Amino acid sequence: MALQRRTTLTKYLIEQQRETNNLPADLRLLIEVVARACKAISYHVSKGALGDALGTAGSENVQGEVQKKLDILSNEILLEANEWGGNLAGMASEEMEQFFPIPANYPKGEYLLVFDPLDGSSNIDVNVSIGTIFSVLRCPDGQQPTEQSFLQPGTQQVAAGYAVYGPQTVLVLTTGNGVNCFTLDRELGSWVLTQSDMRIPVETREYAINASNERHWYPPVQQYIGELKDGKEGSRQSDFNMRWIASMVADVHRILNRGGIFMYPADKRTPDKPGKLRLMYEANPMAFIVEQAGGAATNGEKRILDIQPKSLHERVAVFLGSKNEVDRVTRYHLETKK
């Protein structure tokens, strides 16, 4: 019986390093460390109640959100896995108010790691897919970062990815040369390439939005969703299906595989806030991945990757997925603004 040749994450990254000359060794090693941390998080997620990791931790993060035990554990895993490797100048996490400088007793590198350690954590206790989102930037200030060092537009990302902890654990990755998906082989402990050069279909008949907030939406979103709900009898002359998991990684992963549009708009309840999702930890890495897969991502008015962050925890509205639908809802926003 012939041995089946499979491409592991390590092999894929080494081949990219050789073929494109566009993947520095330090960046390759950093991605591998993040992937190992995601394996550890996946293990704790899969233990569920058996690992005493369910439930709340009795604390809030900088966003004012109640932290789950797994939120805190996942954050610690990512920090501890990456602080000593010598590839990073600093890290920033959705769960921490300030950025995390690399301790003085460890070597430092030229990259910055930004992450949401456990996206969709409201779903932990009900066993719905959750995940980790991460982004890598170069540190413009050498090895002594300040908060300003992190405040770079998404176009400056050198890598981004997410892991989904679901029926399978998968890692989706881009280094600016397309999007690939790796599945965790638990028997071997390796990430194995299972989807290459992922592409989002341009046309779609699915959309993801929290429809319970409809009464709070601004007119452009109400107009767009109204057209989708009207189906064949309306101006779009086609039926659309709504899918909403309330876990960004799960919703985006579905869209990456079969098309669709994900929307988390600003609304009238908090008119002083431009949205709910975090630009640095969620919107930028997902926008990078989606664009690399042929999709589009905007805040309703401009490309997400072009937004200049003003703070580590800045929030934005998000519309991403199949290009034609993102372009349409963005056009409605711009027409309303005229």
Swiss-Prot record:
GO MF annotations for this entry?
fructose 1,6-bisphosphate 1-phosphatase activity; magnesium ion binding
Q: What is its main location?
A: cytoplasm
* Binding annotation for substrate: D119, G120, S121, S122, N210, K276
Asked if the record carries the keyword Metal-binding, the reply is yes
Q: Name one GO biological process term.
A: fructose 6-phosphate metabolic process
The residues that hold Mg(2+) 1 are: E94, D116, L118
Obligatory cofactor(s)? Mg(2+)
Reply yes or no: does the keyword Metal-binding apply.
Answer: yes
**Free-text remark on how the cofactor is bound:** Binds 2 magnesium ions per subunit.
Alphabetical GO CC annotations of the entry are: cytosol
Q: Which UniProt keywords apply?
A: Carbohydrate metabolism, Cytoplasm, Hydrolase, Magnesium, Metal-binding
Q: Where does Mg(2+) 2 bind?
A: D116, D119, E282
Superkingdom, natural source: Bacteria
Q: What is its EC number?
A: 3.1.3.11
Catalysed reaction(s) here are: beta-D-fructose 1,6-bisphosphate + H2O = beta-D-fructose 6-phosphate + phosphate
User: Which EC class heads this enzyme's classification?
Assistant: hydrolase
Query: Which pathway does this polypeptide act in?
Result: Carbohydrate biosynthesis; gluconeogenesis
**Where does the record say this protein resides?**
Cytoplasm
* Family according to the record: Belongs to the FBPase class 1 family.
On assembly, the entry states:
Homotetramer.
- The molecule here is called Fructose-1,6-bisphosphatase class 1 1
Q: Which organism is the protein's source?
A: Paraburkholderia xenovorans (strain LB400)
